[in-house]
Every structure is written in C-alpha cells, then in structure tokens.
Amino acid sequence: MPNTQILAGPQVRLRPPVVEDAEALYARIASDPEVTRYLSWCPHSGVAETRRVITTLFNVGDEQTWLVEVDGQVAGLCARRRPQPYAVELGYCLAPQWWGRGLMSEAVSLMLADLRSDPTVYRVTAYCHADNAGSAGVLRRCGLSLEGRLARYAMFPNISDEPQDVLLFGKAVR
C-alpha cells in the first residue's frame, strides 16, 4: 500500500521518498559504506539503482518507508513493516553528518507515536547488529527494551557472508 503519510517533529520531517530524491539518497545514504555497514543491503552501484529501489521496493506490500529530512535536506530513511498482523518491525539509517544529534531517535519516536493510533498493533520490534551501539542507543532512548541477543540471526553483507548476531529490542504498545 503506498505511503502518503507525513510525520513531523521539532527537528525532522518524515515523508514518502520520491524518484527526485534518488541523487541525494545515493550520495548521502545508499553509496556510503559507513551507512550501509550495518544494513541488510550493499551500497548501490549508482543513482540508477537508487532510483529503481525508490520506484519498485519502497512502500510495497506491508512496508512503509519514509525519507528523513533535516532542514529540508535528505538525511536518512526509516521504515516499518508488519511481519505479523499484530506486530510492526522498524528499520532505519542516517547519513553520518547527522549522527549523534538525536535525530533518528526523534524519527523513530514519530513512527512509534503514529503506531499508537492503530488499534491493530500490539507489539513493536527492531533488531540491530550486536556491535552497532549507536542503533541500540536509539532503540533504548525510544523506550524499546533489550529482549535478547540472537545468535547468527541476520545477514549483514557489508560485514560478512555469514549470518551475524543481533540485539533484539521490543515493546508492547497496548
């Protein structure tokens, strides 16, 4: 289902990505090995690949993706998907120039606040690579609790060709 929703906070604005965002997304997010290190996808090979992802993969099926804007600039991405009818899983990434400023915590908090109005959502989860302290901090600041370390749970192709350990965070929202 297409995402048309805009969420806004004091520092960030979340809006659906459009094809015109491809160059900025490629330059700041999709081509940066620092950003993609702990993601499930490899850096894009060019703007054309980013354009293709925007038009074919974002906001398809049960996933909603937002572009994170800071001062009108492309700063990151965040998404949520429904692995089960009653649960939502969150994911996100942010360009390094905006790390350490609480921006992704604000973006995730906006997604969580929006979910509270959905009576069909009972649980929210997110996981991050076990070594990704920054992401774990975002999830803790947003009120998710560490539920455990899952051994060899997810692929991070920019780290290894073998499954890696993750930290699983969760929260009941009703």
Regions found by a protein language model. Give the residues of each.
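Acyl-donor (CoA/ACP) binding surface of acyl/acetyltransferases
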Residues: 1-24, 28-32, 67-174
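Conserved GNAT-fold acetyl-CoA-binding loop/helix
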Residues: 34-56
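Generic macromolecular interface patches on structured domains
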Residues: 35-36, 45, 60, 121, ...
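Histidine kinase transmitter module recognition
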Residues: 42, 57-60, 118, 127
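A short hydrophobic/aromatic micro-motif that marks alpha-helical segments and, especially, helix-coil
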Residues: 46-48, 61, 158
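A short helix-loop-beta-strand connector motif used in the catalytic cores of GNAT acetyltransferases and
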Residues: 54-67, 76
